[in-house]
């Protein structure tokens, strides 16, 4: 092992945060210095040249002042026996740079801790707990101890459970020691079947059976027979869900049988490269819509970042593994936790009810979990466009009397939608003799028993088993696998995939048997052919671990050569681990021990283990009505706006890329002030169409504490009111995912679950014409622990999360909550689907006063709800609505406030028509919406509402103005008069506190201050050219198409939209992978232009873009090609985002680029996804010809975009050279250092540069993602199909003549 010192690991504010944590623990720590340490496991010693190359590779990141280390050394590394995602990617880079002697690289952080007095062992343990995550990391006292990272253990043998002589008792003991979570009747089933086989089961067979038959995988409760209050029920829960499909099968192509459901989409031109020529073009075909929503609650409670990250990753794999290959497109993520209790910002309704030591508190879940979910989506290259966040934790009187209800076991929901070809929707038959393949990363000893562990209430499994069930994420590997799947489905009828499943709970022990069973085959497998990075694992560990980023496939022998070539090009590892057999039998051979760990008929594993029967009793709630004593209106408003469920969610949104693909038509951020209040997410189906897809969410979980059925109905209803202002048409076009979370077995909850499923499956959905073709359940939503001898528990309410998916006719027609002050005289109309009942039970108002109340909102009339949807569809289609916002958490007060925030305007509302009870009128959470309409169209709108049965519940409640006043009257009496800006700031406090805790607090403070500025004009546009003129048209008309190399490296994810932009400008865009260049399959001298695209090459390890650049610099053949291209005078090049970082590291090869800076970690130390205003500078860049002085917004999505110069002279030289091409400006048009207008903190607001001759341009923002007007989060009226940034690409075409 060779040890190589790295750069300092912590910025000043990160050090200060650690010191603050030490002070809070009364530790005498006076200083902390940290630097990265690299450990290289070598097959042979490196010569001087190789060592120098390795040292250069390991020099990366921002320049931070180095210190000579002093103090106590604590070395934090990944846990020995695990391989970090950093290690896999850094090792890839080293090997792609020709360092073949590097077997593996790993990284640790050496902390040097100084203290005013010597630390005791107890104090050292506290410091260790502050600097490392015990779930994923270890701490050593010296550098050499890191050798443990590379120690290779001998393979461990399997063990047998002796039931032949030990009987049932032997299996009962194994059930506990292995954490199998087998039910009593399953133990009987296994004893009986292995006795019949005449042999003892191996541990691996038992674990495999436990995973395949866990509640998590088999959904036993949803398939059970039920007796409620002594009466046998006619249907299982699942049958009631399936009833929605039986009643409304319209538009559903696949339901209940695959990894995701599929519904009919639109016929569009799907844009992708031709499999033979690799030239991008449009393929006119059906782009059907696939949809899936998963939960990952247990892992997120244990270790939030990897828990949420692998939750998103697993759901993405479900979409890719649908049919015989799908394409994930847009994501969502949601969280429900107990109260945050932010230090120094504790709220009056937040009581500390305690928690067990093995799970993380709600605050840490929300500081870490969302980052994990966002990071996976970002790195994979999927925009995250939707979500929700709710907190609930209270002692209430519910069905089981007085008890603490809350979410110590959180809900972490990950979902999304994608597209799939018509001919790929159904899986094929697996041919006998087919190769059975594992595609993706290697097996590692992680995530063991995750399926069974998540099926238990938190606290029932031993802590080290919880520890074992945590997973690791490597999204860049998953991206490579998805690229393989993409290449396969793009072959159309020649797709080599016959069958595909993702690897999830239970690992390949679940996935491979499921694969062959669903394909009506058996399988013969070789254990030692499974790719394995930890040779010391036992057969059980190799077979059952839940290493992520893996898929299992069946490929016919004659298609293996094509499949192999695709995998090699994409650098996606795979292995043939078995062969499909005619006989339905499962065999697993172990060549190392020369034995057969598994040898069983498929029907024992996946046959009919005993069906569950559940008996339940209905319990009634006796909760007192809400008391109003001491509730003062102004204080109530402030409390509700601070409740995390209602409060601004920016801290959850700007961490997630919302523009990748260039197909996003509606993200969370609305209008010129980019306020996060969108009702739903909308994507375009392709670049040549306005057809698209929409998704929205609905959940009202606290209501279940009063009325199970009402909670379920409201979830469905809210998903509809959220999506109603998009252009969908027939309500039957909407399909729902239902995710059910329940503390099964808790008094009253089983009967309540049955009531809720019946309410939507048998009643509401059939009445509305809605189908639920997909969903998931998590039946162990309870946390138990012992605190000082006292048994404690926190039980979640029954929680139904509904996600609605729909095909959209015209994405341009989507209406947002932004109130419009530029449309003349307008009115606000409330449609109240509660019909004046104004029920306050389980509302935000009740919660912030520590109450529950008695009667909650409900859907009393399905026909009226459908009438509401139909009315909104008619008004959307006729362009009659200026703004639309549904009424939900916080009631009408919050709906109006959020609309005012988005419109930056005043509101004058009168609620006299809503009854005398002001609190009930303002804070009830009955379904409904507020719309803004022009006064000259008001009668027409009201008549449309009346025609749909809504006349009695539609009320004109006010108007808007350009002021800062938020005024609510009842008749002539003013009941609330506030400054909109003040309310906006209160609404923002929660997000500010969370950002300040998690990110650079100086940046968080600047963003918070900016929200106090009422004079902010918002985003605006000033162009030096006509956006609707196509200056490339004359050149395109000539028919010549210059060749454009669309360059990508493993992990790059923005290449398709880049190709689409150049294609539109008249180029022949060709897909080129770096592996094509390194293997000589592609030669750059055939091309006129080259673009290095954005994404996460090598997952940004070794510096963003640096690993990619070094794989060029350290490879003689690649270096020569790039240098020759840059020196050819009739070429041009562009680098965007990751490509910008990469080209800046190649500046030694690029003429006139010698002054270019480096791009390093953002000042906020956070991935920043913003829609930022920039100004094009006067420069010689061929891309910006005629654009100087233009000011327009652009997509920003990066974690390492801050310009780093050597010193002030370097910066002055850059400015003097005239090579600055783009700068960030504030909304007044001035270059700015203020965050978030300058999202990365670059000096002089520089974010784009060019060479002295203008042929090579680099920029951090993404013009290719907003080349269409519809892809801009906000655009001024008057722009046609092309957005302003299309001019860049047209300039490139004009430049070549």
Curated annotation (Swiss-Prot):
Entry-linked PROSITE patterns: GATASE_TYPE_1
Subcellular location: Cytoplasm
Documented EC number(s): 6.3.5.3
GO molecular function, one term: ATP binding
Major site of localization recorded for this protein: cytoplasm
The keyword Ligase is assigned to this record: yes
Keyword hit for Ion transport: no
Transmembrane segments: none
GO CC aspect terms: cytoplasm
Reactions catalysed, as given in the entry: N(2)-formyl-N(1)-(5-phospho-beta-D-ribosyl)glycinamide + L-glutamine + ATP + H2O = 2-formamido-N(1)-(5-O-phospho-beta-D-ribosyl)acetamidine + L-glutamate + ADP + phosphate + H(+)
Domain of life: Bacteria
Function: Phosphoribosylformylglycinamidine synthase involved in the purines biosynthetic pathway. Catalyzes the ATP-dependent conversion of formylglycinamide ribonucleotide (FGAR) and glutamine to yield formylglycinamidine ribonucleotide (FGAM) and glutamate.
Subunit architecture: Monomer.
The protein's name: Phosphoribosylformylglycinamidine synthase
Source organism of this protein record: Vibrio vulnificus (strain CMCP6)
